[in-house]
Curated annotation (Swiss-Prot):
GO molecular function terms noted in the UniProt entry: structural molecule activity
Gene3D superfamilies given in the database record: f41 fragment of flagellin, N-terminal domain (1.20.1330.10)
GO cellular component: bacterial-type flagellum hook; extracellular region
Compartments where found: Secreted; Bacterial flagellum
Biological classification of the source: Bacteria, Bacillati, Bacillota, Bacilli, Bacillales
Alphabetical keyword list: Bacterial flagellum, Secreted
Similarity comment text for this entry: Belongs to the bacterial flagellin family.
One Pfam short name: Flagellin_C
InterPro entries, sorted: Flagell_FlgL, Flagellin, Flagellin_C, Flagellin_N
Predominant cellular place of this UniProt entry's protein: secreted
Gene it is expressed from: flgL
Protein's name in the database: Flagellar hook-associated protein 3
Length: 298
């Protein structure tokens, strides 16, 4: 087959174009740090990246859920602990009120303090974090405990707040108000009603049922302590899961990086080598495509 000058020029241009393409690809890898810039560059790498990115996003979502769960559990435990401390103070006042040396003024003063502690406990029960009532489950836009104004208090029935923290694993992160504040006494009162009755007894001077009051205080304190222990167990479980999620995130990030990221030093070295090849290609092709008719006749 006769090789013409036109064929030589076409081949030369093709080699130069191929060299430019290699340089462009290497330059893109250096600037982005990635092996590919579009799926067509390497479909296998692209498919693996899609898979690994999905896995990493899922793990990161679980970690975000776990972070929210930690916040909810920590706030709940803190407030229940404050509630237990309040009842401990109320118990001290109940014991003090039984002292025969206390007259009516002293017991009424104790009654004022009990009222303040009751109001403080009510504020704890209706605690809001980021605009949400943490003790009212999924109905977090409304306060869980309502003062009816007649010595009775309504405590909401709530649905649990459940958070997905891993594949096929979820965790209850809230405490419903009835469990969080000790349930009800043998007489059917909740803790707020018991405190209200105790306050009224102090103001009226009727202290015949003080043993019952002390028993009720212990009952509510025990119930709240049990709920706090349950919160602690859930918190420990969450910590274990979160540790595993952190390890999974680290692994997924590494696998994704190994699949997508270039070894920058290697690519730079290859780029420099390709530049040398490109310059040589240009020089050689310049000699090939330049000859004129006179050059051939020499």
């Amino acid at each position: 087959m006769r090789v013409t000058q036109g064929m030589i020029q076409q081949n030369s241009l093709r080699y130069i174009g191929s060299s430019y393409s290699k340089l462009d690809k290497l330059q893109s890898q250096i600037s982005s740090g990635k092996k590919i810039s579009k799926a067509s560059d390497d479909p296998v790498v692209a498919m693996k990246s899609l898979k690994y990115n999905t896995q990493l996003s899922q793990v990161q979502q679980y970690k975000s859920n776990a972070s929210q769960a930690f916040t909810w559990l920590e706030n709940t435990e803190t407030n229940i602990t404050e509630g237990i401390d309040i009842l401990s103070k109320v118990r001290e006042l109940a014991v003090e009120a039984q002292n025969d040396t206390n007259g009516e003024p002293e017991r009424q003063a104790i009654g004022v303090e009990v009222k303040q502690l009751k109001e403080q406990l009510l504020n704890i029960a209706n605690t809001q974090v980021n605009g949400r009532y943490i003790f009212n489950g999924t109905n977090s836009d409304k306060p869980p405990v309502t003062d009816n104004g007649d010595g009775t208090y309504t405590i909401s029935d709530t649905a649990d707040v459940v958070v997905n923290i891993s594949n096929n694993m979820s965790l209850k992160v809230n405490s419903d108000p009835k469990s969080a504040f000790g349930g009800t006494s043998e007489s059917g009162q909740n803790v707020f009603e018991m405190l209200d009755s105790f306050e009224k007894a102090l103001n009226s001077g009727s202290l015949d049922g003080m043993d019952s009051v002390l028993n009720d205080i212990d009952h509510f304190s025990d119930g709240m302590s049990a709920e706090r222990s349950d919160l602690g167990a859930r918190y420990n479980r969450l910590e274990l899961v979160n540790t595993r999620l952190s390890a999974q995130e680290e692994t997924a990030t590494k696998v994704l990086s190994d699949n997508e990221d270039v070894e920058l030093e290697e690519v730079i070295t290859e780029f420099i080598a390709q530049q040398s090849v490109h310059r040589a290609t240009l020089a050689v092709n310049a000699q090939i495509v330049q000859p004129t008719l006179i050059d051939f006749l020499k």
